[in-house]
């Protein structure tokens, strides 16, 4: 059966290939998404190293002059997705969105290069671009020592509980009429609500009205929430960029120093109740819910004994690790996007950190559970952690990618 799934995973990656870049899945997500693309590269590296590097090169080719790599690149027209390039109005030569997404590309590039050192020249060419992107995060998003996101989509965890407090202060009442496309592809009960979408669009309209001034968006915009997940990913990305540069024989452009600077600011997101937590940087108020971003602390070398206890409780509370919200909380919603479900690609990131922290048994639990979910339900976007029901989009690129690169090949340092 595993051999059949290997072939199916490769077919999904090649089937979602649009010529130099992949889409997350046909229909629901018809463009190039930033962190999806980085995971796609990891998957391609198990059978086509050249194509893996091309994926990352295509992504970084659409970097903005200020260093930002946007969260969506609209390579071609497709009316099946909203909000499209006209709504964003960024004015880029190839249309893009006006925000970014968690910077996992350096981490993927490092693992890809470690598996095949012959591609060092291609890695070397990416280092300055990735370093410029990381510096952009420091300049345009780091406030009070940690990453503050200006839109829930920038976190990649669109409707997580983390953003509810900040979103309550966003006025979505004047966005005008619009037609969502996502709920025509998947069950609406698995997607963000209309009220959430109204506020998402209000934030896009604010950015557009202010010329996508990235610093102004952080300093004056309607929403700024410190995100543990993106902060931990950026710390790890800076560590991995330094290692990538060393392996490729080029300067790391300050990556190691950026990582240490960020580690020094982590106290901002440590909730006194004993866990890493999102925090509204406009009000100083913690979210108060143990959510998915916290599980990436080990990825950044920021594990604490309190988090070990939370991990054990969460693993014991569901059949399939790892729920994106503490399953003991009343707010846990097993099938609604980032309010409870298990995401295979996120499990891979969590497991990478756990393995590096010496938690081999916990990392293996995530690998085995994720494999069981895929064997039982296919290559879906995410799953119900209580019973394994597949949810969201099917034939999903990053789910196929982590099957090949993590579950089957054991690629990377978490093997």
Kindly give the residue locations of the regions a language model identified:
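Alpha-helical support elements that line or immediately flank enzyme active sites
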Residues: 37-66, 293-303, 347-360, 367
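Extended glycan-interaction surfaces of carbohydrate-active proteins
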Residues: 1-32, 56-95, 146-225, 263-342, ...
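TPR repeat positional signature
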Residues: 37, 41, 102, 106-109, ...
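Core register positions within helices of long alpha-helical scaffolds
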Residues: 43, 108-111, 115, 237, ...
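Hydrophobic/aromatic-rich effector regions of fungal transcription factors
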Residues: 87-100, 104-118, 349-353
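Long, repeat-rich segments with strong aromatic
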Residues: 220-248, 252-255, 261-262, 336-361
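Internal, well-ordered domain-core segments that constitute the primary functional module
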Residues: 101-167
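Extended, well-ordered alpha-helical scaffold segments
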Residues: 4-9, 48-61, 119-138, 237, ...
């Amino acid at each position: 059966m595993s051999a059949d799934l290997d072939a199916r995973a490769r077919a999904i990656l090649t089937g979602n290939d649009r010529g130099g870049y992949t889409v997350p899945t046909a229909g629901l997500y018809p463009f190039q998404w930033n962190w999806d693309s980085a995971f796609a590269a990891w998957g391609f590296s198990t059978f086509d190293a050249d194509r893996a590097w091309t994926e990352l090169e295509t992504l970084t080719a659409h970097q903005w002059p200020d260093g930002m790599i946007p969260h969506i690149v609209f390579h071609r027209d497709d009316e099946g997705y909203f909000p499209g390039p006209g709504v964003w109005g960024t004015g880029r030569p190839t249309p893009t969105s006006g925000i970014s997404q968690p910077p996992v590309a350096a981490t993927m590039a490092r693992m890809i290069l470690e598996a095949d050192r012959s591609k060092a020249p291609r890695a070397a060419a990416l280092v300055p671009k990735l370093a410029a992107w990381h510096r952009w995060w420091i300049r345009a998003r780091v406030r009070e020592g940690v990453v503050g996101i200006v839109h829930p989509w920038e976190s990649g965890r669109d409707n997580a509980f983390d953003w509810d407090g900040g979103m309550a202060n966003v006025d979505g009442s004047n966005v005008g009429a619009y037609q969502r496309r996502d709920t025509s592809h998947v069950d609406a009960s698995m997607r963000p609500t209309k009220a959430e979408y109204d506020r998402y669009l209000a934030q896009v309209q604010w950015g557009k009205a202010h010329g996508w001034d990235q610093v102004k968006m952080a300093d004056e915009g309607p929403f700024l929430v410190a995100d543990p997940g993106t902060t931990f990913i950026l710390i790890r990305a800076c560590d991995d960029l330094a290692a990538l540069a060393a392996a490729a024989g080029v300067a790391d452009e300050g990556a190691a120093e950026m990582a240490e600077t960020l580690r020094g600011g982590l106290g901002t997101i440590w909730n006194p109740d004993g866990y890493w937590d999102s925090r509204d940087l406009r009000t100083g108020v913690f979210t108060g819910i143990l959510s998915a971003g916290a599980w990436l602390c080990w990825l950044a070398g920021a594990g604490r004994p309190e988090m070990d206890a939370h991990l054990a409780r969460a693993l014991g509370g569901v059949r399939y690790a790892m729920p994106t919200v503490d399953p003991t909380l009343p707010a846990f919603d097993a099938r609604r996007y980032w309010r409870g479900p298990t995401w295979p690609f996120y499990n891979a990131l969590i497991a990478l950190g756990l393995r590096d922290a010496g938690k081999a048994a916990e990392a293996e639990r995530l690998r085995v559970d994720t494999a069981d979910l895929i064997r039982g339900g296919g290559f879906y976007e995410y799953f119900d952690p209580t019973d394994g029901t597949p949810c969201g989009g099917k034939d999903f690129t990053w789910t196929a990618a982590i099957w090949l690169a993590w579950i089957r090949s054991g690629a990377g340092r978490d093997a």
